[in-house]
Amino acid sequence: MGSQRRALAVVALGLASLLAGCAAPEPWVKPYERERLADPIMRLSRDALADKHREHIYDVRESARGATGVQGGGCGCN
Amino acid sequence: MVATSGSSIWMRRLRRALARRPHHLMRAGRALGVVGGVMAAGGAYAIDLPEDRADAMYHFYDGGGTRADGPALLIRKKVADRLSISGSYFIDSVSNASIDVVTTASPYKEKRTEYSLGADYVYRDAQVSLSGTTSDEPDYKANSVSLDVSQEVFGGMTTISLGASRGADHVGSRYEGMFDRAQHWRYRFGVTQILTPRWLMSANLEAISDNGYLGNPYRVAQVFGTLVQERYPRTRSSRALKLRAVGDIGQGEQRAALRAEYRYFWDNWEIKAHTLEVGYTRYFGAEWLGEAFVRYNTQKQALFYSDNAQSETLYVSRNKQLSDFNDVGIGAKATYSAGKIADKFDVKWNAQYQFMRFRYKNFTDIRTHGLYSFDANILELFVSATF
């Protein structure tokens, strides 16, 4: 029991000494470096209405559904 | 209702941030000290609302004996500093002579009408979206509400989103009227992360829970070569995980984006599916934008699926959507920017086409006893205006 506590103390001290050299990570891509990311071609969904049509077609014909990153549900699919 | 995803929130924010120059940030940093500098680069400003926009679309699907087409409209408008509302209208005119229908019943036509209303509210680095959808066809009525919240953190590099939807359906048939109900719950969680000045990625997880009548009153199963009414479980629990990455691979002034998406889906009917999509988008001059993409989906059958069951079981279905199959799609999209009209409306004309091929591994055409497959053509023509 005592040896377990000593081992834990050593691990805790070791971790503390490792973390002592670290600062909290800062955002590494500054707003003024995001010009290319702001272009419309970088959007995950550019045209909501066309994407909705596409998702409806997939939902009706494939079993997989969900996790598209948009609100869903409500289609009559039988 | 399709609402803006977390990723588009920070896209809007990026455009706003780009209006500010690096030296402005440095000046702010000097004036306010190190903490102030970090704040200026980080989350000291509110998110912009989605831009005002109107879309009018004609959509078309033709494949496997089913043809569906119709118009769709979407309009979104800011009504206050922090509030934007949206509405959409979607018509599906369906002419159904699919293999399920022609082998067991008569082809039919029907119309589905869907209305959606939504509201987006922004406060500092957060956005709250509420929407409601109602879908109506003669033998199926569906209503749903959704609530989503997203929050930017870590200097705008990370967006976290949480959401839930609740759906309630009335299920019927042309012969019996409305005879049963179904309910759906959806819970979703997503993270979008800027990786480098050129690359970002997102991860989305969604859990879906359904109960009630989940089958189709027109479809039949086959047991010992005899056609019988299909028997579905009344509950289903599904999970989906989707990973996406998109990057700008253009050189110099040229902008070109490469995107890759992968989704793994699994549920307690023992269906497992993998979906992969890769797309490439680039500008052709100042007015044209072109996109090409390929998509592949493969799935393993549900536990109770059988083309022709050789034993009596509690549940049995011959729904080809639950069988072993794969489908591939290849598509292209072109966008033409027509410029400003009436000094206010930024108009774009769009055309998108996709060819799909479905190949079933254990679903046969009972007329020929051969494995079934079909091709589909999908088209969207739409004009959009931002203002």
Segment roles from a protein language model:
Chain B
Residues 58-62, 91-95, 123-125, 134-138, ...:
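Transmembrane beta-strands of outer-membrane beta-barrel pores
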Residues 73-77, 117-121, 147-151, 189-193, ...:
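Residues on the lipid-exposed face of transmembrane beta-strands in outer-membrane beta-barrel proteins
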Residues 45-51, 82, 154-158, 198, ...:
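Short loop/turn motifs that connect adjacent beta-strands in outer-membrane beta-barrel proteins
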Residues 1-50, 387:
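Cleavable N-terminal export/targeting peptides
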Residues 100, 104-105, 208, 214-246, ...:
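Outer membrane beta-barrel transmembrane domains
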Residues 52-56, 85-87, 128-130, 158-162, ...:
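Transmembrane beta-strands of outer-membrane beta-barrel proteins
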Residues 67-71, 111-115, 122, 141-145, ...:
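Residues that define the transmembrane beta-barrel architecture of outer-membrane proteins
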Residues 44-86, 356, 377-378:
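Short glycine/proline- and aromatic-enriched beta-strand/turn motifs that initiate or cap beta-hairpins
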